[in-house]
From Swiss-Prot:
Function: Specifically methylates the pseudouridine at position 1915 (m3Psi1915) in 23S rRNA.
Any GO CC annotation of this UniProt entry: cytoplasm
Binding positions for S-adenosyl-L-methionine per the UniProt entry: L73, G104, L123, S124, P125, L126, T127, L128
Organism: Pseudomonas putida (strain GB-1)
Record protein name field: Ribosomal RNA large subunit methyltransferase H
Designated gene of the protein: rlmH
Length: 155
């Protein structure tokens, strides 16, 4: 099974890269977790933010192949417990399609990306810093896998 986090933003601090890679490497080879970074467009004082978000959304969608699943991470998405995420992970595995987890930039996801989503997931009603979201997603995917495999990490 292939999971990809497609996230707007690049050049993250070292601790973010280390955190992400720590959880990605813990997963078994049959569950790959990869990161695809979409460069954040420069936001100047007079920038057309709607246009920039649309461009970022187009770049995100260009990384998705026909037939692949899109799951957006949104404040108004559905919150999942660890056990519910494990159930979703198992369903995704059985579905045998690549799953693309989409995280937008500072202003969120483009409407075009949200319109393509098969599922909408909310990590929290809180506004979370996007670098931290990457690590949280990696950790939660790893935790869900440990639930499914009976590993003692999740107690």
């Amino acid at each position: 099974m292939r999971l990809r986090l497609i996230a707007v933003g690049s050049r993250m601090p070292k601790w973010v890269e280390e955190g992400w890679h720590e959880y990605a490497k813990r997963l078994p080879t049959e569950l790959s977790l990869e990161l695809v970074e979409i460069p954040l467009n420069t936001r100047g004082k007079n920038a057309d933010v709607a246009r920039l978000i649309r461009q970022e959304g187009e770049a995100m969608l260009s990384k998705v192949q026909p037939g692949e699943r899109i799951v957006t991470l949104e404040v108004h998405g559905k919150p999942w417990s660890t056990e519910q995420l494990a159930t979703e992970l198992d369903r995704w595995r059985l579905d045998a399609r690549t799953v693309n987890l989409m995280v937008g930039g500072p202003e969120g996801l483009a409407p075009e990306v949200c319109a393509r989503a098969e599922q909408r997931w909310s990590l929290s009603p809180l506004t979370l810093p996007h670098p931290l979201v990457r690590i949280l997603i990696g950790e939660q995917i790893y935790r869900a896998w440990t639930v499914l495999s009976g590993h003692p990490y999740h107690k």
